[in-house]
Protein backbone atom coordinates (compact mmCIF):
# COMPACT_ATOMS: atom_id res chain seq x y z
CA UNK A 1 0.00 0.00 0.00
CA UNK A 2 1.43 3.37 -1.05
CA UNK A 3 0.43 6.33 1.14
CA UNK A 4 0.72 9.90 -0.10
CA UNK A 5 1.22 13.29 1.52
CA UNK A 6 -1.84 15.13 2.90
CA UNK A 7 -2.96 18.30 1.11
CA UNK A 8 -0.93 17.44 -1.97
CA UNK A 9 -1.70 15.78 -5.33
CA UNK A 10 -0.39 12.48 -3.93
CA UNK A 11 -2.74 12.49 -0.91
CA UNK A 12 -4.44 9.30 0.23
CA UNK A 13 -7.86 10.75 1.06
CA UNK A 14 -10.39 9.14 3.41
CA UNK A 15 -13.86 10.52 4.20
CA UNK A 16 -15.50 9.72 7.54
CA UNK A 17 -19.29 9.86 7.68
CA UNK A 18 -19.83 10.66 11.35
CA UNK A 19 -17.35 12.67 13.38
CA UNK A 20 -18.20 11.89 17.00
CA UNK A 21 -15.78 10.67 19.65
CA UNK A 22 -15.15 7.35 17.89
CA UNK A 23 -14.67 9.01 14.53
CA UNK A 24 -12.28 11.51 16.11
CA UNK A 25 -9.98 8.72 17.27
CA UNK A 26 -10.12 7.05 13.85
CA UNK A 27 -9.14 10.36 12.25
CA UNK A 28 -6.16 10.71 14.60
CA UNK A 29 -5.07 7.14 13.82
CA UNK A 30 -5.32 7.77 10.07
CA UNK A 31 -3.43 11.05 10.29
CA UNK A 32 -0.57 9.35 12.10
CA UNK A 33 -0.19 7.26 8.95
CA UNK A 34 -0.12 10.34 6.73
CA UNK A 35 -3.70 10.09 5.47
CA UNK A 36 -5.70 13.17 4.48
CA UNK A 37 -9.04 13.02 6.29
CA UNK A 38 -12.36 14.69 5.52
CA UNK A 39 -14.87 14.60 8.40
CA UNK A 40 -18.63 14.85 7.83
CA UNK A 41 -21.34 15.24 10.46
CA UNK A 42 -24.82 16.70 10.91
CA UNK A 43 -23.69 19.54 13.22
CA UNK A 44 -20.81 22.01 13.37
CA UNK A 45 -17.71 21.54 15.50
CA UNK A 46 -18.26 17.82 16.09
CA UNK A 47 -15.30 16.15 17.85
CA UNK A 48 -13.86 14.79 14.60
CA UNK A 49 -14.26 18.15 12.85
CA UNK A 50 -11.78 19.59 15.32
CA UNK A 51 -8.91 17.37 14.13
CA UNK A 52 -9.69 16.65 10.46
CA UNK A 53 -8.04 18.33 7.47
CA UNK A 54 -11.49 19.45 6.26
CA UNK A 55 -14.95 19.38 7.78
CA UNK A 56 -18.43 19.40 6.25
CA UNK A 57 -21.92 19.62 7.73
CA UNK A 58 -24.70 17.89 5.79
CA UNK A 59 -27.76 15.74 6.36
CA UNK A 60 -26.21 12.33 5.70
CA UNK A 61 -29.64 10.76 5.22
CA UNK A 62 -30.01 12.94 2.10
CA UNK A 63 -28.68 10.68 -0.64
CA UNK A 64 -28.26 13.44 -3.22
CA UNK A 65 -26.29 15.66 -0.81
CA UNK A 66 -24.12 12.74 0.23
CA UNK A 67 -23.32 11.76 -3.35
CA UNK A 68 -22.55 15.36 -4.31
CA UNK A 69 -20.07 15.72 -1.46
CA UNK A 70 -18.32 12.45 -2.30
CA UNK A 71 -18.09 13.47 -5.96
CA UNK A 72 -16.59 16.82 -4.93
CA UNK A 73 -14.04 15.45 -2.43
CA UNK A 74 -13.11 12.31 -4.41
CA UNK A 75 -12.00 10.16 -1.45
CA UNK A 76 -10.32 6.82 -1.97
CA UNK A 77 -12.28 5.36 0.95
CA UNK A 78 -15.62 6.29 2.51
CA UNK A 79 -15.80 5.16 6.14
CA UNK A 80 -19.24 5.29 7.83
CA UNK A 81 -19.02 5.82 11.60
CA UNK A 82 -22.74 6.13 12.38
CA UNK A 83 -25.97 4.40 11.34
CA UNK A 84 -28.00 7.41 10.15
CA UNK A 85 -26.74 7.47 6.56
CA UNK A 86 -28.42 7.13 3.16
CA UNK A 87 -27.05 3.65 2.58
CA UNK A 88 -28.79 3.27 -0.78
CA UNK A 89 -26.63 6.15 -2.00
CA UNK A 90 -23.53 4.33 -0.75
CA UNK A 91 -24.53 1.25 -2.74
CA UNK A 92 -24.81 3.42 -5.86
CA UNK A 93 -21.49 5.15 -5.16
CA UNK A 94 -19.74 1.80 -4.78
CA UNK A 95 -21.34 0.38 -7.93
CA UNK A 96 -20.30 3.49 -9.88
CA UNK A 97 -16.70 3.12 -8.70
CA UNK A 98 -16.64 6.61 -7.14
CA UNK A 99 -15.11 5.33 -3.88
CA UNK A 100 -14.66 2.16 -1.86
CA UNK A 101 -17.10 1.97 1.06
CA UNK A 102 -15.74 0.42 4.27
CA UNK A 103 -16.16 -2.42 4.94
CA UNK A 104 -18.59 -2.71 2.00
CA UNK A 105 -21.73 -0.80 1.05
CA UNK A 106 -23.74 -4.01 1.54
CA UNK A 107 -22.39 -4.44 5.07
CA UNK A 108 -23.25 -0.85 5.96
CA UNK A 109 -26.73 -1.28 4.50
CA UNK A 110 -27.38 -4.51 6.41
CA UNK A 111 -26.12 -3.23 9.75
CA UNK A 112 -27.72 0.21 9.64
CA UNK A 113 -30.79 -1.25 11.33
CA UNK A 114 -31.44 -4.15 13.64
CA UNK A 115 -33.75 -5.95 11.22
CA UNK A 116 -31.18 -6.41 8.48
CA UNK A 117 -28.46 -7.80 10.70
CA UNK A 118 -30.78 -9.90 12.89
CA UNK A 119 -32.30 -11.62 9.88
CA UNK A 120 -28.83 -12.21 8.42
CA UNK A 121 -27.51 -13.70 11.66
CA UNK A 122 -30.52 -15.76 12.72
CA UNK A 123 -32.23 -16.66 9.46
CA UNK A 124 -29.39 -16.75 6.91
CA UNK A 125 -26.48 -17.94 9.07
CA UNK A 126 -28.52 -19.83 11.68
CA UNK A 127 -26.69 -18.24 14.62
CA UNK A 128 -28.23 -18.40 18.10
CA UNK A 129 -30.03 -15.19 19.11
CA UNK A 130 -32.76 -14.13 21.50
CA UNK A 131 -36.32 -14.84 20.28
CA UNK A 132 -37.64 -11.78 18.44
CA UNK A 133 -40.36 -10.20 16.34
CA UNK A 134 -40.43 -7.08 14.16
CA UNK A 135 -43.50 -4.87 14.49
CA UNK A 136 -44.97 -1.75 12.90
CA UNK A 137 -47.70 -0.74 15.35
CA UNK A 138 -48.55 -0.60 19.02
CA UNK A 139 -51.04 -3.46 18.62
CA UNK A 140 -48.41 -5.64 16.93
CA UNK A 141 -45.92 -4.79 19.68
CA UNK A 142 -48.34 -5.87 22.41
CA UNK A 143 -49.17 -9.09 20.55
CA UNK A 144 -45.48 -9.89 20.06
CA UNK A 145 -44.76 -9.37 23.75
CA UNK A 146 -47.59 -11.71 24.72
CA UNK A 147 -46.35 -14.32 22.26
CA UNK A 148 -42.70 -14.10 23.37
CA UNK A 149 -43.60 -13.83 27.05
CA UNK A 150 -42.68 -11.06 29.48
CA UNK A 151 -40.19 -9.61 30.18
CA UNK A 152 -39.21 -8.30 26.75
CA UNK A 153 -36.83 -5.68 25.38
CA UNK A 154 -38.28 -3.09 22.98
CA UNK A 155 -36.00 -1.15 20.59
CA UNK A 156 -36.39 0.93 17.44
CA UNK A 157 -34.89 -0.91 14.47
CA UNK A 158 -32.58 2.07 14.07
CA UNK A 159 -31.12 3.92 17.05
CA UNK A 160 -27.82 4.21 18.89
CA UNK A 161 -26.47 4.47 22.45
CA UNK A 162 -29.59 2.86 23.89
CA UNK A 163 -31.97 5.56 22.64
CA UNK A 164 -35.54 4.28 22.56
CA UNK A 165 -34.64 0.99 24.25
CA UNK A 166 -36.45 -0.26 27.34
CA UNK A 167 -37.24 -3.40 29.29
CA UNK A 168 -40.94 -4.20 29.67
CA UNK A 169 -41.89 -6.48 32.56
CA UNK A 170 -45.66 -6.55 32.04
CA UNK A 171 -48.42 -5.28 29.75
CA UNK A 172 -48.95 -2.21 31.93
CA UNK A 173 -45.55 -0.86 30.90
CA UNK A 174 -46.02 -1.32 27.16
CA UNK A 175 -47.50 2.10 26.31
CA UNK A 176 -44.57 3.93 27.91
CA UNK A 177 -42.13 1.63 26.08
CA UNK A 178 -43.88 2.30 22.77
CA UNK A 179 -43.77 6.08 23.25
CA UNK A 180 -40.09 5.97 24.22
CA UNK A 181 -39.22 3.77 21.23
CA UNK A 182 -41.01 6.14 18.84
CA UNK A 183 -39.06 9.10 20.24
CA UNK A 184 -35.75 7.22 20.12
CA UNK A 185 -35.80 6.05 16.51
CA UNK A 186 -33.31 7.87 14.27
CA UNK A 187 -34.54 7.35 10.72
CA UNK A 188 -37.21 4.65 10.38
CA UNK A 189 -39.38 5.72 13.31
CA UNK A 190 -42.20 3.30 12.54
CA UNK A 191 -40.56 -0.13 12.93
CA UNK A 192 -39.38 -1.86 16.07
CA UNK A 193 -37.93 -5.10 17.39
CA UNK A 194 -39.36 -6.92 20.40
CA UNK A 195 -36.92 -9.39 21.96
CA UNK A 196 -37.34 -12.07 24.57
CA UNK A 197 -34.96 -11.69 27.50
CA UNK A 198 -32.03 -14.11 27.66
CA UNK A 199 -30.84 -15.30 31.05
CA UNK A 200 -27.13 -14.56 30.58
CA UNK A 201 -24.20 -14.32 32.97
CA UNK A 202 -22.50 -11.41 31.20
CA UNK A 203 -22.24 -9.69 27.82
CA UNK A 204 -19.14 -8.97 25.80
CA UNK A 205 -17.89 -7.10 22.79
CA UNK A 206 -15.53 -9.18 20.68
CA UNK A 207 -13.58 -6.78 18.50
CA UNK A 208 -13.03 -8.67 15.25
CA UNK A 209 -10.60 -7.45 12.59
CA UNK A 210 -10.63 -8.42 8.93
CA UNK A 211 -7.21 -7.40 7.58
CA UNK A 212 -4.76 -8.42 4.89
CA UNK A 213 -2.22 -11.10 5.76
CA UNK A 214 1.30 -11.16 4.31
CA UNK A 215 -0.06 -13.41 1.56
CA UNK A 216 -2.52 -10.71 0.52
CA UNK A 217 -5.55 -12.73 1.62
CA UNK A 218 -8.04 -11.35 4.15
CA UNK A 219 -7.72 -13.03 7.53
CA UNK A 220 -9.77 -12.65 10.70
CA UNK A 221 -8.20 -11.75 14.04
CA UNK A 222 -9.70 -11.16 17.46
CA UNK A 223 -8.94 -8.86 20.37
CA UNK A 224 -9.26 -10.11 23.93
CA UNK A 225 -12.96 -10.10 24.93
CA UNK A 226 -14.31 -6.89 26.45
CA UNK A 227 -16.83 -7.08 29.27
CA UNK A 228 -19.23 -4.18 29.64
CA UNK A 229 -22.03 -2.78 31.74
CA UNK A 230 -24.98 -1.18 30.01
CA UNK A 231 -27.79 0.85 31.56
CA UNK A 232 -30.92 1.13 29.37
CA UNK A 233 -28.85 -0.06 26.43
CA UNK A 234 -26.16 2.60 26.85
CA UNK A 235 -22.55 1.72 27.66
CA UNK A 236 -21.50 2.89 31.13
CA UNK A 237 -18.21 1.05 31.67
CA UNK A 238 -16.09 -1.62 29.99
CA UNK A 239 -13.10 -3.75 30.92
CA UNK A 240 -10.61 -6.02 29.20
CA UNK A 241 -10.07 -8.92 29.32
CA UNK A 242 -13.38 -10.46 30.36
CA UNK A 243 -12.79 -13.91 31.85
CA UNK A 244 -14.44 -16.67 29.79
CA UNK A 245 -14.26 -20.43 29.59
CA UNK A 246 -12.16 -21.73 26.67
CA UNK A 247 -15.29 -23.27 25.17
CA UNK A 248 -17.25 -20.02 25.35
CA UNK A 249 -14.37 -18.03 23.88
CA UNK A 250 -14.00 -20.46 20.99
CA UNK A 251 -17.75 -20.31 20.30
CA UNK A 252 -17.73 -16.50 20.48
CA UNK A 253 -14.96 -16.38 17.91
CA UNK A 254 -16.83 -18.81 15.64
CA UNK A 255 -19.95 -16.64 15.74
CA UNK A 256 -17.99 -13.42 15.18
CA UNK A 257 -16.06 -14.94 12.28
CA UNK A 258 -19.28 -16.19 10.67
CA UNK A 259 -21.13 -12.87 10.76
CA UNK A 260 -18.16 -10.68 9.81
CA UNK A 261 -17.17 -13.11 7.07
CA UNK A 262 -20.65 -12.85 5.60
CA UNK A 263 -20.49 -9.04 5.74
CA UNK A 264 -17.06 -9.06 4.09
CA UNK A 265 -14.64 -6.24 3.39
CA UNK A 266 -11.83 -4.92 5.58
CA UNK A 267 -11.87 -3.22 8.95
CA UNK A 268 -12.77 -3.68 12.58
CA UNK A 269 -16.19 -4.94 13.70
CA UNK A 270 -17.70 -4.72 17.18
CA UNK A 271 -19.57 -8.00 17.74
CA UNK A 272 -21.85 -8.01 20.80
CA UNK A 273 -22.59 -11.37 22.43
CA UNK A 274 -24.42 -12.76 25.46
CA UNK A 275 -22.71 -15.52 27.44
CA UNK A 276 -24.01 -18.03 29.99
CA UNK A 277 -21.50 -20.68 30.98
CA UNK A 278 -20.31 -22.20 27.71
CA UNK A 279 -23.34 -20.98 25.73
CA UNK A 280 -23.06 -17.89 23.52
CA UNK A 281 -25.75 -15.89 21.71
CA UNK A 282 -25.28 -13.28 18.99
CA UNK A 283 -26.73 -9.86 19.82
CA UNK A 284 -25.57 -7.16 17.38
CA UNK A 285 -22.62 -6.13 15.19
CA UNK A 286 -21.28 -2.73 14.17
CA UNK A 287 -18.94 -2.56 11.14
CA UNK A 288 -16.78 0.05 12.86
CA UNK A 289 -15.07 0.75 16.21
CA UNK A 290 -17.34 0.20 19.19
CA UNK A 291 -17.97 2.50 22.14
CA UNK A 292 -17.12 -0.25 24.64
CA UNK A 293 -13.82 -0.65 22.80
CA UNK A 294 -12.55 2.72 24.04
CA UNK A 295 -10.91 0.69 26.80
CA UNK A 296 -8.37 -0.44 24.19
CA UNK A 297 -6.89 3.06 24.25
CA UNK A 298 -5.27 1.89 27.49
CA UNK A 299 -4.97 -1.87 27.12
CA UNK A 300 -3.77 -2.91 23.66
CA UNK A 301 -0.61 -2.54 21.63
CA UNK A 302 -2.83 -1.17 18.86
CA UNK A 303 -6.15 0.26 20.00
CA UNK A 304 -9.37 -0.37 18.10
CA UNK A 305 -9.04 2.87 16.14
CA UNK A 306 -5.50 2.07 15.02
CA UNK A 307 -6.61 -1.44 14.08
CA UNK A 308 -9.47 -0.04 11.99
CA UNK A 309 -7.19 2.49 10.28
CA UNK A 310 -4.56 -0.12 9.46
CA UNK A 311 -7.07 -2.71 8.28
CA UNK A 312 -8.93 -0.40 5.91
CA UNK A 313 -5.62 0.74 4.40
CA UNK A 314 -4.50 -2.86 3.86
CA UNK A 315 -1.73 -2.67 6.47
CA UNK A 316 -0.63 -5.32 9.03
CA UNK A 317 -2.39 -5.37 12.42
CA UNK A 318 -1.54 -6.52 15.95
CA UNK A 319 -4.52 -7.37 18.19
CA UNK A 320 -2.38 -8.25 21.21
CA UNK A 321 -3.31 -7.21 24.75
CA UNK A 322 -0.68 -5.21 26.64
CA UNK A 323 -2.25 -5.06 30.12
CA UNK A 324 -5.66 -5.26 31.83
CA UNK A 325 -7.71 -2.09 31.93
CA UNK A 326 -11.11 -0.45 32.15
CA UNK A 327 -13.09 2.57 31.00
CA UNK A 328 -15.89 4.55 32.67
CA UNK A 329 -18.12 7.13 31.01
CA UNK A 330 -18.16 10.81 32.00
CA UNK A 331 -21.66 12.20 31.42
CA UNK A 332 -22.62 15.80 30.68
CA UNK A 333 -24.62 16.13 33.94
CA UNK A 334 -25.97 19.52 32.76
CA UNK A 335 -27.79 20.85 29.71
CA UNK A 336 -25.55 23.60 28.36
CA UNK A 337 -23.33 24.70 25.49
CA UNK A 338 -19.58 25.16 25.82
CA UNK A 339 -19.25 23.56 29.24
CA UNK A 340 -16.04 23.32 31.27
CA UNK A 341 -14.68 20.44 33.34
CA UNK A 342 -13.58 20.69 36.96
CA UNK A 343 -11.60 18.02 38.78
CA UNK A 344 -9.41 16.95 35.87
CA UNK A 345 -6.25 17.31 37.97
CA UNK A 346 -7.70 15.17 40.76
CA UNK A 347 -8.82 12.50 38.29
CA UNK A 348 -5.37 12.27 36.71
CA UNK A 349 -3.51 12.13 40.02
CA UNK A 350 -4.00 8.36 40.39
CA UNK A 351 -1.31 6.17 38.75
CA UNK A 352 -2.46 4.38 35.61
CA UNK A 353 -5.35 6.77 34.91
CA UNK A 354 -5.96 8.77 31.73
CA UNK A 355 -8.86 10.78 30.32
CA UNK A 356 -10.42 11.52 26.96
CA UNK A 357 -12.65 14.62 26.91
CA UNK A 358 -14.45 14.59 23.59
CA UNK A 359 -14.95 18.32 22.98
CA UNK A 360 -18.64 18.09 22.11
CA UNK A 361 -20.04 21.62 21.72
CA UNK A 362 -23.23 20.90 23.66
CA UNK A 363 -23.86 18.85 26.80
CA UNK A 364 -26.97 17.03 27.99
CA UNK A 365 -27.45 15.34 31.32
CA UNK A 366 -26.99 11.84 29.86
CA UNK A 367 -24.77 12.72 26.92
CA UNK A 368 -21.37 11.02 26.86
CA UNK A 369 -18.83 13.85 27.13
CA UNK A 370 -15.69 11.90 28.00
CA UNK A 371 -14.26 8.68 29.33
CA UNK A 372 -11.86 7.76 32.10
CA UNK A 373 -9.30 5.04 31.35
CA UNK A 374 -7.27 3.00 33.80
CA UNK A 375 -4.83 0.09 33.81
CA UNK A 376 -4.00 -2.17 36.74
CA UNK A 377 -2.97 -5.72 37.60
CA UNK A 378 -6.53 -6.96 37.04
CA UNK A 379 -9.69 -5.77 35.27
CA UNK A 380 -11.50 -5.46 38.62
CA UNK A 381 -8.81 -3.19 40.04
CA UNK A 382 -8.83 -1.12 36.84
CA UNK A 383 -12.62 -0.75 37.03
CA UNK A 384 -12.36 0.77 40.49
CA UNK A 385 -9.74 3.25 39.29
CA UNK A 386 -11.67 4.23 36.16
CA UNK A 387 -14.96 4.74 38.01
CA UNK A 388 -13.26 6.81 40.71
CA UNK A 389 -11.56 8.99 38.10
CA UNK A 390 -14.78 9.51 36.13
CA UNK A 391 -16.60 10.56 39.30
CA UNK A 392 -14.02 13.29 39.96
CA UNK A 393 -14.57 15.03 36.61
CA UNK A 394 -17.40 17.54 37.00
CA UNK A 395 -18.93 19.17 33.91
CA UNK A 396 -20.04 22.73 34.74
CA UNK A 397 -21.85 25.41 32.73
CA UNK A 398 -19.90 28.59 32.00
UniProtKB/Swiss-Prot annotation:
Q: Which Pfam families match?
A: ATP-grasp, PurT_C, RS_preATP-grasp-like
Which catalysed reactions does the entry list for this protein? N(1)-(5-phospho-beta-D-ribosyl)glycinamide + formate + ATP = N(2)-formyl-N(1)-(5-phospho-beta-D-ribosyl)glycinamide + ADP + phosphate + H(+)
Q: What is this protein called?
A: Formate-dependent phosphoribosylglycinamide formyltransferase
Q: According to its UniProt record, in which pathway does this protein act?
A: Purine metabolism; IMP biosynthesis via de novo pathway; N(2)-formyl-N(1)-(5-phospho-D-ribosyl)glycinamide from N(1)-(5-phospho-D-ribosyl)glycinamide (formate route): step 1/1
Question: Which biological processes are named by the entry's GO terms?
Answer: 'de novo' IMP biosynthetic process
Q: Can you state the subunit structure given in the record?
A: Homodimer.
Name all ATP-grasp domain ranges. 119-313
Report the family membership: Belongs to the PurK/PurT family.
Q: Which organism is it from?
A: Thiobacillus denitrificans (strain ATCC 25259 / T1)
Q: For binding ATP, which residues are annotated in this chain's numbering?
A: 114, 155, 160-165, 195-198, 203
Q: Describe the function of this protein.
A: Involved in the de novo purine biosynthesis. Catalyzes the transfer of formate to 5-phospho-ribosyl-glycinamide (GAR), producing 5-phospho-ribosyl-N-formylglycinamide (FGAR). Formate is provided by PurU via hydrolysis of 10-formyl-tetrahydrofolate.
State its Enzyme Commission number(s): 6.3.1.21
Q: Please tell me one Gene Ontology term that the record gives under cellular component.
A: cytosol
Which keywords annotate this record?
A: ATP-binding, Ligase, Magnesium, Metal-binding, Nucleotide-binding, Purine biosynthesis
Give the GO molecular function terms. Answer: ATP binding; magnesium ion binding; phosphoribosylglycinamide formyltransferase 2 activity; phosphoribosylglycinamide formyltransferase activity
Q: What superkingdom heads the lineage?
A: Bacteria
- UniProt xrefs under Gene3D superfamilies: 3.40.50.20, ATP-grasp fold, A domain, ATP-grasp fold, B domain
Q: Where are the transmembrane segments?
A: none
Which PANTHER family did the record assign? FORMATE-DEPENDENT PHOSPHORIBOSYLGLYCINAMIDE FORMYLTRANSFERASE
Q: Which residues are noted in the entry as Mg(2+)-binding?
A: 272, 284
Binding of N(1)-(5-phospho-beta-D-ribosyl)glycinamide, residues: 21-22, 81, 291, 360, 367-368
